[in-house]
């Protein structure tokens, strides 16, 4: 476990970031010596941007390509907005899970319901007014989610969201409210487009 955690910190070091919210729950210490590499080519910069996105959201290559095709068809959303509408990303953003990995585990183990239907697919794309809630019979999972919500919102004095989510562990997805939860992640979508030649 310790070795796995160290490799995560090394990846952050490689990306020249101190934090990737969906990938690692710890901050990289600033005093660590950066990894020395050769000259940076344009391809390498594009590759790094793609890798940041891939590791943060736990995506595969074919999934990223598929989302770019959605952008061409819909002509509305950008890449990050489509990925943020995935069920695993939404569970993480709401604070029910500490990381994307934990959110994926909650979904695949059958603890998440959408509009009274059990969903076990982390890549499920949500729409406006979808009702998301935790299985009320799973008391240990409810306790874990409440603890996660406490550390996400209550300590930051965002009591409105905390009381909204924690009482019944339900959340109705609304466009205006949803994007207020969006946390800044340093992705350059244009560089990722150039990498995939879209």
UniProtKB/Swiss-Prot annotation:
Keywords assigned: Apicoplast, Plastid, Ribonucleoprotein, Ribosomal protein, RNA-binding, rRNA-binding
Gene Ontology cellular component list: apicoplast; small ribosomal subunit
Any GO BP: ribosomal small subunit biogenesis
Gene3D superfamilies according to UniProt: Ribosomal Protein S4 Delta 41, Chain A, domain 1, RNA-binding S4 domain
Plastid found in the keyword field: yes
Subcellular location(s) of the protein: Plastid, Apicoplast
Annotated GO MF terms: rRNA binding; structural constituent of ribosome
PANTHER family: 30S 40S RIBOSOMAL PROTEIN, SMALL RIBOSOMAL SUBUNIT PROTEIN US4M
Summary of subunit composition and partner proteins: Part of the 30S ribosomal subunit.
Name of the molecule in the record: Small ribosomal subunit protein uS4c
Organism lineage: Eukaryota, Sar, Alveolata, Apicomplexa, Conoidasida
